[in-house]
From Swiss-Prot:
HAMAP family: GlgC
One BP annotation, GO: glycogen biosynthetic process
InterPro entries: ADP-Glc_PPase, ADP_Glu_pyroP_CS, GlgC_bac, NTP_transferase_dom, Nucleotide-diphossugar_trans, Trimer_LpxA-like_sf
Enzyme Commission (EC) number: 2.7.7.27
Residues that, per the record, bind alpha-D-glucose 1-phosphate: G162, E177, K178, S209
Family: Belongs to the bacterial/plant glucose-1-phosphate adenylyltransferase family.
Name by which UniProt lists this protein: Glucose-1-phosphate adenylyltransferase
Length: 429
């Protein structure tokens, strides 16, 4: 895989994941208690022996830069690197990134310097585990100019995706963006061509793009330089290229989830706690997900009742009940609390005991969850200070609300408490 360079698209302003992207780039959003979204594609690359990795981003890239610099240091005897490339304005191009393809186009001068044969283009907000070596080998074996990784899906979910049709050789011959009705029926294909059994093919007669592509070097450069007005890979570049180039489909038949919205992000995190077998597991020593080593102490539990939950390292939990939840590193939960079906991202630091005591005496709220607080169906971002006897339960079943001055939003019925927010004692949300 020395002849492959990976480009991870960090996305735009992250409006679908707002307010989690208020102070950070989308790839830097914490996931599963201790990781960040960027760790998923980077780990997949490392496990696939791809060590040349660029991450393209446009907004709030400081925490992403810091995380990557501390985590992925390939100094030594190979050419490996993980580098963040932020959008920049130049005399030749005064614009920011206009789309996924435009982001790559603006850095072609840098990509060109490397002696590689293929470019692997990935998204920064998906949860999955994939060996890209098999994907790239299929690309080479079929002599493809472009290969798309696709998933088989059933009729119920099909209209939510960009679908495609293939011929008997696996070549993509048609695209349709989120079709409905008769247009949807026309996009049915025989997915057994890609390796499914007849029974599986009948249940899942559609294929959808995962937003993962591999390009021949000369094809990528030609398409981006000749079609300057086309700014998006999935909607413009690849559908147009399928007319003149050999665009192949590669079937990925394992867990894959786009977690680019608050609702999908919330459910994907809580699904990690499912028993006996979650849909995605971080407990795979043959293909681990890497992240920054923090050297934190073990978690301390004092008279707690915990069921179906994930607790990050360095947490302190006192006489509380945690059910079907994910708690991030350095989470602090005081006595009498009930946390149900919630994602707590933890904290970036510990408050000293003296500082916490002074905060309580002065009626300030320390970092963490105060005594007798109930949190249900919520996401609590990092370093939140939640007082005692608070109820975050969305009691009125509100679906959408913006209360930034009060420290929270509601997205798809999920209460999202902002990073560094302060929720006073006795508050009911």
């Amino acid at each position: 895989m020395k002849k492959v360079l990976s480009i991870i698209l960090g996305g735009g302003a992250g409006t679908r994941l707002y307010p989690l992207t208020k102070l950070r780039a989308k790839p830097a959003v914490p996931v599963a208690g201790k990781y960040r979204l960027i760790d998923i594609p980077v780990s997949n690359c490392i496990n696939s022996e791809i060590f040349k990795i660029y991450v393209l981003t446009q907004f709030n890239s400081a925490s992403l830069n810091r995380h990557i610099a501390r985590t992925y240091n390939f100094t030594g005897f190979n050419e490996g690197f993980v580098e963040v490339l932020a959008a920049q304005q130049t005399p030749e191009n005064p614009n920011w990134f206009q789309g996924t393809a435009d982001a790559v186009r603006q850095y072609l001068w840098l990509m060109e310097e490397w002696d590689v044969e293929e470019y692997l283009i990935l998204s920064g907000d998906h949860l999955y585990r994939m060996d890209y070596r098999q994907f790239i080998q299929r690309h080479r074996d079929t002599g493809a100019d472009i290969t798309l990784s696709v998933i088989p899906i059933d009729e119920r979910r099909a209209s939510d995706f960009g679908l495609m049709k293939i011929d008997d050789s696996g070549r993509i011959i048609d695209f349709s963006e989120k079709p409905k009705g008769e247009a949807l029926t026309q996009m049915q294909v025989d997915t057994s061509v890609l390796g499914l059994t007849k029974e599986q093919a009948q249940k899942q007669p559609y294929i959808a793009s995962m937003g993962i592509y591999v390009f021949k070097k000369e094809v990528l450069f030609k398409l981006l330089r000749e079609s300057v007005e086309r700014t998006d890979f999935g909607k413009e570049i690849i559908p147009d290229a399928s007319k003149d180039y050999n665009v192949q489909a590669y079937l990925f038949d394992d867990y894959w989830e786009d977690i680019g919205t608050i609702e999908a992000f919330y459910h994907a995190n809580l699904a990690l706690t499912q028993q006996p077998q979650p849909p995605f597991s971080f407990y795979d020593e043959h293909a681990p997900i890497y992240t920054r080593a923090r050297y934190l102490p073990p978690t301390k539990l004092l008279d707690c009742q915990i069921t179906e939950s994930i607790i990050g390292e360095g947490c302190i939990l006192k006489n509380c009940r945690i059910q079907h939840s994910v708690l991030g590193v350095r989470s602090r939960i005081e006595s009498g609390c009930v946390i149900e079906e919630s994602l707590l991202m933890g904290a970036d630091f510990y408050q000293a005991s003296v500082e916490r005591q002074c905060s309580l005496i002065e009626n300030d709220i320390p970092v963490g969850i105060g005594t007798d607080t109930i949190i249900r169906g919520a996401i609590i971002d990092k370093n939140a200070r939640i007082g005692h006897d608070v109820k975050i339960v969305n009691k009125d079943n509100v679906q959408e609300a913006e209360r930034e001055n009060q420290g929270f939003y509601i997205r798809s019925g999920i209460v999202v408490v902002l990073k560094n927010a302060v929720i006073p004692d006795g508050t009911i949300i």
